[in-house]
């Protein structure tokens, strides 16, 4: 069964733009560099040629990965979701029960994730551990080191 990838319209458009940029800017540059390296002669010992072919393969893999996300995209209208529980698109403030630390996360879809600014994938194990919880409830999240417990302090929507 193919798993859908939840995302906002903005996230979808961002991924489409990234694919377009890769196909129309990066790929032609790599193809040009391959052609230039090919003109150097013997391909068996041509390091530049082999490096650019490898770059081309890695770029194609990235393009295909993004195309797969787009093909499985499920565009979510955040305004239609419940406002009293942790769901896609909300910003949730939690307290680490073990340490008392307060943290804030926004649950986002593919294309919108930015871990440095607290935007985590709703499909990640951490995101899934929070989904469906209400203010005052405790979420248990499985991590390699065991289970972490987080108390839900606040749920907000920035619509």
UniProtKB/Swiss-Prot annotation:
<dbReference type="InterPro" id="IPR036953">
    <property type="entry name" value="GreA/GreB_C_sf"/>
</dbReference>
<dbReference type="InterPro" id="IPR036805">
    <property type="entry name" value="Tscrpt_elong_fac_GreA/B_N_sf"/>
</dbReference>
<dbReference type="InterPro" id="IPR018151">
    <property type="entry name" value="TF_GreA/GreB_CS"/>
</dbReference>
<dbReference type="GO" id="GO:0006354">
    <property type="term" value="P:DNA-templated transcription elongation"/>
</dbReference>
<comment type="similarity">
    <text>Belongs to the GreA/GreB family.</text>
</comment>
<keyword id="KW-0804">Transcription</keyword>
<keyword id="KW-0805">Transcription regulation</keyword>
<feature type="coiled-coil region">
    <location>
        <begin position="53"/>
        <end position="73"/>
    </location>
</feature>
<keyword id="KW-0238">DNA-binding</keyword>
<dbReference type="InterPro" id="IPR006359">
    <property type="entry name" value="Tscrpt_elong_fac_GreA"/>
</dbReference>
<protein>
    <recommendedName>
        <fullName>Transcription elongation factor GreA</fullName>
    </recommendedName>
</protein>
<dbReference type="InterPro" id="IPR022691">
    <property type="entry name" value="Tscrpt_elong_fac_GreA/B_N"/>
</dbReference>
<dbReference type="InterPro" id="IPR001437">
    <property type="entry name" value="Tscrpt_elong_fac_GreA/B_C"/>
</dbReference>
<dbReference type="InterPro" id="IPR023459">
    <property type="entry name" value="Tscrpt_elong_fac_GreA/B_fam"/>
</dbReference>
<dbReference type="GO" id="GO:0003677">
    <property type="term" value="F:DNA binding"/>
</dbReference>
<dbReference type="InterPro" id="IPR028624">
    <property type="entry name" value="Tscrpt_elong_fac_GreA/B"/>
</dbReference>
<comment type="function">
    <text>Necessary for efficient RNA polymerase transcription elongation past template-encoded arresting sites. The arresting sites in DNA have the property of trapping a certain fraction of elongating RNA polymerases that pass through, resulting in locked ternary complexes. Cleavage of the nascent transcript by cleavage factors such as GreA or GreB allows the resumption of elongation from the new 3'terminus. GreA releases sequences of 2 to 3 nucleotides.</text>
</comment>
<dbReference type="Pfam" id="PF03449">
    <property type="entry name" value="GreA_GreB_N"/>
</dbReference>
<dbReference type="GO" id="GO:0070063">
    <property type="term" value="F:RNA polymerase binding"/>
</dbReference>
<dbReference type="Pfam" id="PF01272">
    <property type="entry name" value="GreA_GreB"/>
</dbReference>
<keyword id="KW-0175">Coiled coil</keyword>
<dbReference type="GO" id="GO:0032784">
    <property type="term" value="P:regulation of DNA-templated transcription elongation"/>
</dbReference>
């Amino acid at each position: 069964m193919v798993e859908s990838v939840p995302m906002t319209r903005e996230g979808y458009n961002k991924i489409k733009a990234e694919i377009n940029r890769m196909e129309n800017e990066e790929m032609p540059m790599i193809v040009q560099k391959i052609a230039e390296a090919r003109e150097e002669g013997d391909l068996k010992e041509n390091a530049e040629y082999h490096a650019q072919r490898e770059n081309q393969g890695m770029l194609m893999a990235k393009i295909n990965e993004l195309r797969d996300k787009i093909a499985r995209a499920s565009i979510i209208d955040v305004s239609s979701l419940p406002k009293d529980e942790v769901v896609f698109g909300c910003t949730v403030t939690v307290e680490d029960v073990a340490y008392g630390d307060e943290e804030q996360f926004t649950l986002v879809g593919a294309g919108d994730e930015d871990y440095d600014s607290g935007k985590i994938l709703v499909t990640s194990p951490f995101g899934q551990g929070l989904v469906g919880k209400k203010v005052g409830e405790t979420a248990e999240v499985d991590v390699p080191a065991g289970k972490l417990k987080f108390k839900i302090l606040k749920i907000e929507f920035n619509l």
